[in-house]
């Protein structure tokens, strides 16, 4: 999953970067309001961690621009030193998914991100059962019959993203963007994603049939449940 950190306090931004990268997230940074608005206009993100006190403007303006874009469901967590209740209410009213006052624990941030994933995809817990495969979002593991599969980080991310979007066709471009980040930085070979999906499907099929894992010709993939 990809995350845009909009935070001008570089030490905090880099701490979040290191912590979330170790948890498997793909990180991008925007240090100012202008660069944040430019990025969200071009790319979509699974999460936007948004500071309100930016050097060239208010983070609320970034939130407003995001919400004005069509067909976007980027989850927004506001991170700010502002403690006023009015600011919290304003952020939530304008479409933020959560509000975390500074200073905060990185583990709490991660827990809130997991909670948003559960709400967004209507999950009761961090585990999802897909045709006998148990995907654990928090531990980033996939197992079958109590045996853990040896998936690479990217294979897990692909499976995770497809599972969270089950019964929907996920395009190759969308999959690339959410697993590898900025699509412009990814190998332009059209077979790039297909190779990773082929390896993932091979590992899944080795323990159980995967006729539910569909390739939608010329578009992408779909997991049917």
What are the roles of these predicted feature ranges?
Residues 1-120:
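N-terminal/domain-start alpha-helical segments
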Residues 129-141, 219:
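Short boundary/linker motifs that mark transitions into or out of structured domains
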């Amino acid at each position: 999953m990809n995350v845009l950190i909009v935070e001008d306090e570089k030490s905090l931004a880099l701490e979040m970067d290191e912590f979330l990268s170790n948890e498997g997230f793909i990180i991008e940074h925007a240090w100012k309001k202008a660069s944040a608005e430019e990025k969200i206009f071009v790319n979509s993100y699974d999460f936007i961690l948004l500071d309100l006190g930016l050097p060239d403007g208010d983070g609320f303006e970034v939130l407003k621009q995001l919400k004005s874009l069509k067909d976007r469901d980027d989850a927004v967590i506001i991170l700010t030193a502002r403690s006023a209740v009015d600011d919290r209410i304003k952020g939530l009213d304008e479409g933020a998914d959560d509000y975390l006052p500074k200073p905060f624990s990185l583990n709490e941030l991660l827990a809130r991100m997991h909670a948003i994933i559960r709400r967004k995809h209507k999950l009761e817990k961090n585990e999802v059962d897909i045709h006998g495969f148990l995907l654990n979002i928090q531990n980033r593991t996939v197992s079958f019959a109590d045996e853990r599969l040896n998936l690479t980080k990217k294979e897990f991310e692909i499976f995770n993203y497809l599972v969270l979007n089950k019964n929907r066709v996920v395009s190759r471009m969308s999959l690339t963007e959410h697993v590898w980040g900025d699509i412009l930085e990814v190998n332009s070979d059209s077979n790039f994603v297909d190779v990773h999906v082929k390896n993932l499907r091979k590992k899944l099929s080795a323990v159980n049939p995967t006729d539910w894992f569909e390739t939608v010709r010329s578009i992408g993939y779909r997991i049917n449940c």
